[in-house]
Amino acid sequence: MCYCKVGADIEKFKKGFQETVSRGPDQSRVITITDGIIGFHRLAIMGLTPSGMQPFALNGSYVVCNGEIYGFAELKKDLKAKGYTFESDSDCEILLPLYREYGTDMFAMLDAEFACVIYDAEKRSFIAARDPIGIRPLYYGYDEDDAIVFASEAKNLVSICDRIMPFPPGHYYKDGQFVCYRDMTKVPSVVGSADDAAGASEVTGTFGSKVTGTFDGKVTGTRDEDLETICKNIHDKLVAGVEKRLVSDAKVGFLLSGGLDSSLVCAIAAKKSDKPIRTFAIGMETDAIDLKYAKQVADYIGSEHTEIYMTKEQVLSSLEDVIKMLGTFDITTIRASMGMYLLCKAIHEQTDVRVLLTGEISDELFGYKYTDFAPSPEAFQKESEKRIHELHMYDVLRADRCISVNSLEARVPFGDLDFVEYVMGIDPAKKVNVYGKGKYLLRHAFEEGDYLPYEILMREKAAFSDAVGHSMVDDLKEYAEGYYTDEEFKELSAKYTHAKPFTKESLLYREIFEKFYPGQGEMIVDFWMPNKEWEGCDVNDPSARVLSNYGDSGK
């Protein structure tokens, strides 16, 4: 957390800072500098000694970073050759030397999941940045004197800022401007020629600010690749994305739903590990769908597997805590968080695992059930771009909060920058479901190599909130239906103009959200829903269960 203001109120800062101590329970530090206050909660993952504690300092400048920098050893080697010395094994210690050498150009050099704030002592200014996907959280707002404040979560800022917004992924903040340094959806081989895509772009940012950036026109070249070449590259790049995320000084585990995405991550990791990996799954006591398939995968890959069961009572009693934790009112995000939160809570309480690999971001790249209804490859690509841009408000937010509130770290192999860039560059005509099976390219990429049972590799997609047990979503709906009368629903929902609640369930979530984040609804652009402009997708529930092509997904 960073309060960028001379004479900032230290007590007000500490009050907000303490809201997220669970993100880093190992050690906390607050320092006051000439131009503000910087605070850091540490969860030790790389470099477990006290020397890895932040903020890191260099010639009066400071940096705090929540992140993992992959391949940092090579960057560190180059910096040592330039004369820099290091006191810890932390990957984040390289950031200030990188900034000194390359300025804000450093952010485009990073293969990382990160959110950071740098204080430049020479210029007496603050620079903030966030990874291109938004896997690591970062929020900002302004106090009563228009001073900017940065923090990992919105709850840090509620007592300081009147309006809070998510920091845009792939941007850095400098001198009052948000500048795009990398947009993962700008792939000229899909959207047009390199000449069309190169050059400056400008969009309206949050708070009405102008966000500018450039694109170098690099062509990925995937338009001319045949299907087998594409699938080989998908295979190789995902394997690399998993492998680099296995590096940790803390114990690593895996969330396993038994669906395609998490199962692939686990299967790849099992092949790359010299001992059985540790996998974890959760489901309702009454009708868990995932547990059966997760056990099948665990047996196949030989993992050390743990099953957790949850009850209706646990779900309902956790609802308010989950919404406060998430900082959202979005229906599908909250539903899917119930099981994930309870699973991660059990992992924290019952094991020594501190890093979890998950299967998020595959859907945004390869398609949901509803994208089977895309009217054209171009529409599919446009929808994928939208989902990638908004990931930080939905699935990625869910994974981060459910995991970090339990003092664990999330790593997302499908969010590997090289992998995302490559898949976004594949001709969308090859990605749309013309094969009779969604996500065909991903499935076909791993048909050889004995990664998974064929039944799992070809299993129909089921949303996590459905697959932990249909009864969980039904229980939440039933609870909300009994919470309000029809008249109360009509009256209470009428007061909202942004993202207006349209069911009693959505109203219940919004009312709880407002209790902890009053007036901050615009942090979330809208409810996550299928594209209602497409035939077959004009539905009023985000669950794939309401789609006509759901088929065997829930079996």
Identify what each model region corresponds to.
Residues 1-64, 68, 97-202, 210-225, ...:
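N-terminal glutamine amidotransferase
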Residues 5-12, 81, 101, 122-127, ...:
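ATP-dependent adenylate-handling active sites, centered on carboxylate activation for C-N bond formation
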Residues 41, 89, 181, 282, ...:
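Conserved beta-strand termini and adjacent loop/short-helix elements that scaffold enzyme active sites
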Residues 75-78:
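Short active-site loop/helix that positions an aromatic residue
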Residues 82-89:
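Short, flexible active-site-proximal loops enriched in glycine and acidic residues
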Residues 92-96:
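Short, conserved phosphate-binding/catalytic loop or strand-edge motifs used
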Residues 453-462:
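Conserved S-adenosyl-L-methionine
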